[in-house]
């Protein structure tokens, strides 16, 4: 059988997420490779990679992400980070930590956010970065609902261009560049993202990640179990007879199930073999992703 599983990759700066996928395709000689959650080239950290049949499980990974980053106040750029053109500068000597703490709560919970002018968000079928390259950036960026669970201040450095280091827990689709821009706007001085590292994503943690540089130096690609990042889903275990029928596409009863309808679950046979993903409906477990076919 060809290579399959997940790779908890630590992406270096300067690489796109697509670059990482292309490199692993060559290293593993496997075409079926995808990633869970794009990282901008300048951003480092956790990039979940799915190999082989694991690509079918990407929609079921948890959506939570954690970032550690630095916001620089008194600077606005065309990309909302340091890679863009400088648009405006302001002195931030008057800015205080207390002012930051007073402003942060409005960015918590479900909020409306506009993506950066240079981003992968699509407008009328084209990505914003493609429009920006042609000088056709839209006058009005789309608003999107995102969720930020927490923002924790790690360090505050006052000065003429003050900097704030934070840890952010958020949902999928949140742009930390937009947060830096919008926080700076609320404070009246402008802001841009100076540095960002993703420390957790989709069930994977930076502490257990493998740097891409190690793989480039010849280290073996560590493939993790298909069900490793799916522990947030409830587990259903089927008997020998029902597991065979489930793998043939039949919905099977789940005894004493208290799971809500449409809830995705991990499905196993009595030997503990991971069979795939099911969905609960009226006490039945319907096959959604069958990995271990008969």
Swiss-Prot record:
UniProt xrefs under Pfam families: TruB-C_2, TruB_C_2, TruB_N
Active site: 40 (nucleophile)
EC number: 5.4.99.25
Known catalytic reactions: uridine(55) in tRNA = pseudouridine(55) in tRNA
Uppermost EC category: isomerase
GO biological process terms held by the UniProt record: mRNA pseudouridine synthesis; tRNA pseudouridine synthesis
Keyword line: Isomerase, tRNA processing
GO molecular function terms noted in the UniProt entry: RNA binding; tRNA pseudouridine(55) synthase activity
Role summary: Responsible for synthesis of pseudouridine from uracil-55 in the psi GC loop of transfer RNAs.
Record family assignment: Belongs to the pseudouridine synthase TruB family. Type 1 subfamily.
Protein name: tRNA pseudouridine synthase B
UniProt source species: Synechococcus elongatus (strain ATCC 33912 / PCC 7942 / FACHB-805) (Anacystis nidulans R2)
């Amino acid at each position: 059988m060809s290579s399959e599983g997940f790779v908890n990759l630590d992406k270096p700066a300067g690489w796109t997420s697509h670059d990482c996928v292309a490199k692993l395709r060559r290293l593993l000689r496997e075409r079926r490779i995808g990633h869970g959650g794009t990282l901008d080239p300048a951003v480092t950290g956790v990039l979940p990679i799915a190999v082989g049949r694991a690509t079918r499980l990407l929609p079921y990974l948890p959506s939570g992400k954690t970032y550690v980053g630095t916001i620089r106040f008194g600077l606005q750029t065309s990309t909302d980070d340091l890679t863009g053109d400088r648009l405006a500068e302001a002195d931030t000597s008057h800015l205080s930590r207390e002012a930051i703490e007073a402003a942060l709560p409005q960015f918590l919970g479900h909020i409306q956010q506009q993506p950066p002018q240079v981003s992968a968000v699509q407008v009328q079928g084209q990505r914003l970065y493609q429009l920006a390259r042609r000088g056709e950036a839209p006058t009005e960026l789309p608003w999107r609902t995102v969720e930020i669970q927490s923002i924790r201040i790690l360090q505050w450095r006052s000065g003429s261009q003050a900097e704030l280091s934070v840890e952010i827990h958020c949902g999928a689709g949140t742009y930390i560049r937009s947060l830096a821009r919008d926080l700076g706007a609320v404070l009246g001085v402008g802001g841009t993202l100076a540095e960002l590292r993703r420390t957790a994503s989709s069930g994977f943690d930076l502490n257990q990640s493998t740097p891409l540089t190690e793989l480039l130096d010849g280290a073996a690609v560590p493939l993790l179990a298909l069900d490793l990042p799916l522990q947030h889903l409830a587990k259903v275990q089927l008997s020998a007879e029902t597991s065979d029928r489930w793998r043939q596409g039949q919905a099977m009863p789940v005894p004493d199930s208290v799971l809500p309808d449409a809830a995705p679950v991990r499905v196993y046979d009595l030997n503990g073999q991971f069979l795939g993903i099911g969905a609960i409906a009226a006490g039945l477990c319907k096959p959604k992703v069958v990995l271990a076919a008969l």
